[in-house]
């Protein structure tokens, strides 16, 4: 897992789960979430 992935898991498990289902990269999701 990337540092971002771990951070998401620690903050909210839904983010990590959604990434797996959507197949979105951790970095991409991080950018979208930050926006």
Swiss-Prot record:
Cellular compartment(s)? Nematocyst; Secreted
- Provide the Gene Ontology terms for cellular component: extracellular region; nematocyst
- Tissue expression as described in the entry: Expressed in tentacles.
Keywords on record: Nematocyst, Secreted
Keyword field contains Methyltransferase: no
Cited function: Peptide with unknown function. Does not exhibit antimicrobial activity against Escherichia coli and Staphylococcus aureus.
The name this protein carries in UniProt is Peptide Hact-3
State the organism of origin: Heliofungia actiniformis
């Amino acid at each position: 897992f990337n540092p971002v992935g771990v951070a998401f898991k620690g903050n909210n498990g839904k983010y990590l789960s959604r990434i797996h289902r959507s197949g979105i990269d951790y970095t991409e999701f991080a950018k979208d979430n930050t926006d």
